[in-house]
């Protein structure tokens, strides 16, 4: 054991001396001598071998020295267990391309048959027979692999030619150049197969440094597996390796190398920044390492986000240091889980002088997932995924706050531009906010920098990860002034297309293409001096167009009253199929009405046949209901009943409709009420309700007017309990007025209800006279009441005698009614209607009140039109 340790120490010293001599004598002769000693396998070879240790090339794993592979097997060599970077000469390049490149051209694939270690004899034999033949090939591979060898002491490839290498450059200069070139190549790659490109570069930098790799790789191993192994091995030892046994490691060497810091040697730009950490609990670790990838196909037959694996072939996703454990199964799953990744926290770095300097502050994490242990550090830092992820959606308060901040920034920049117009102030892109459709439309109309309103945005590209992103606002005054006209025009255009009201106005303002014949008629109608001899036969083929035109419709209406039947028939045959459409046309409905008035019986029957089955629809339309009313006037009674019967199941709906109530009224007027029993039966229990309805009160009046005595009695029996309410109702007062207008020769029930109304009015004459709607009932009571009924009402208003009339109190009924804006009309009716002593007392009371107003110089009611009218009435009245 002690002998082995002494031998190890001697070999270590020999390695250091060899490295120093190689650095001081970097000529090719020394390199060849060193290489010769290695090849011969003697003592000189063992003395020539050495390790040049650097902090960036240390390792914590067991590895075999590459050059020792030439000395013998791992079992026979005591020096084989040392882990140091080889400084010997690299082995010669093999002309058998399959050893390095395989059948597919991938030099990661090695064959197990070519992994036997080389002896000195076989090496010399190989060198003797293949040096001259492979000189050109070695030069090509030398250029392909970046002109770099892991050997410090010798040439890039031992091919027997002293001038094969450019001996003027040392190891570190070559190594640095290859690192820079490789780093640039890695950073410039943006293809999905960048993993293969990175593995190729690493292999170029360190290939042929050791033949021990051939003992560790199996035949036809997939490129992804090789790539991970290459990355893992090159980071830890600086050479390509895979440990085949853990029993041969030296515990003392592991403890000796444990304190060396681990550096990233492949990405020069990131070496002072990222330091890998094997502690899974280190949340603020700076270096992020990728794990070992699973075995899978290397032919890139699967999408890059699946790491080249077919779907549903793996169950557990890879572990990332300081990243959550997730499956990379689909882009959406990948993106959604990468949003919550861990961001490296703040960390102090150490400069070249050994002093710590503070790094820029960064958020430590987005979430706090548990990070798995780092089993295989990647040779270069994994990029921050948050740099490529779209921002998460903002909440409503955050969106409002962002909008307010954006508006404040725009206002400040506009103010700065006003102060100094020669300075350009860039404006950040505003954050798009989802909003309702109407609000978007409003924003689009009023935002001149919206893509729809600004032609300068044609060359601008929005963020593809953001929906409805808005380009940067152009704050140049010159550009704003030059594009103002276009923006205004576009704003008007978007305004017309964004509001339904604007669209309807635009449709109304559209210019219809009229026929020359219609244009001629319109021109002749506007010119009063023109004498147009056009008749119905002249518009043959244009009847429908004329019916829908204002001037054309008037022309047809005028001609139908005087034209012969033949010409009417020609026009009717053109429009008969469009009778339903024309009935609801603003101008065409008058033509259909004229055909009911002046048309033949056959023409009327044809129109009635088209109306059958459409009565409900036509009765509810604004213009068609007028056609139905005209038809009920001119068609036969049987046809009227047949048409109205279609409305039997919708009488209440028709009565409450602003158009349908006119059809019901016309039906009651033109059809005997006994033929329409369904109308009154539908209104049973709804009489008072309909009497207070704006349209129903009209139908109730028509029923009282044209109904039979039994019908009138049934209606009045429902109304007599609601007389005080109907008198003061804005629609019910019309029903009461109709009852008051009926004379005494009507049926007994009507006379009794009228007397009841007069008594109710007389008992509340002052209150009803001052009421806006009830005052109308009081006036009708005075006008249409009998002499006894009139005297009953007047007795509640007139003063007792002449002295009382000259000295009326302010709270007397006469004075209260004169002052009121509604009741003074009742007083005017009393002056015109009253006779004899009653009229004399009324005139005296009015004059006394007017004299009192003049003496008191009161301006309260002096100049009211009603008071002046009263003064004019009593001035000429004879007392």
From Swiss-Prot:
Residues 237-255, 398-417, 449-463, 472-491, 501-512 have a biased composition (Low complexity). GO terms for biological process: aerobic respiration; cellular response to glucose starvation; intracellular mRNA localization; mitochondrion localization; mitochondrion organization; nuclear-transcribed mRNA catabolic process; nuclear-transcribed mRNA catabolic process, deadenylation-dependent decay; positive regulation of translation. Pumilio repeats lie at residues 538-573, 574-609, 610-645, 646-681, 682-717, 718-759, 760-795, 807-844. One of its GO terms (cellular component) is cytoplasm. Present with 846 molecules/cell in log phase SD medium. Residues 513-871 form the PUM-HD domain. It is a peripheral membrane protein. Keywords: Cytoplasm, Membrane, Mitochondrion, Mitochondrion outer membrane, Phosphoprotein, Repeat, RNA-binding. The modification Phosphothreonine is found at residue 83. CDD domains: Pumilio (cd07920). Residues 370-395 have a biased composition (Pro residues). RNA-binding protein involved in post-transcriptional regulation. Negatively regulates expression of COX17 by binding to the 3'-UTR of COX17 mRNA. Promotes decay of COX17 mRNA by enhancing its rate of deadenylation and subsequent turnover. Predominantly binds to mRNAs encoding mitochondrial proteins and localizes them to the vicinity of mitochondria for translation. Regulates mitochondrial biogenesis, motility and morphology. The gene is PUF3. The lineage of its organism: Eukaryota, Fungi, Dikarya, Ascomycota, Saccharomycotina. This is mRNA-binding protein PUF3. Its main location: mitochondrion.
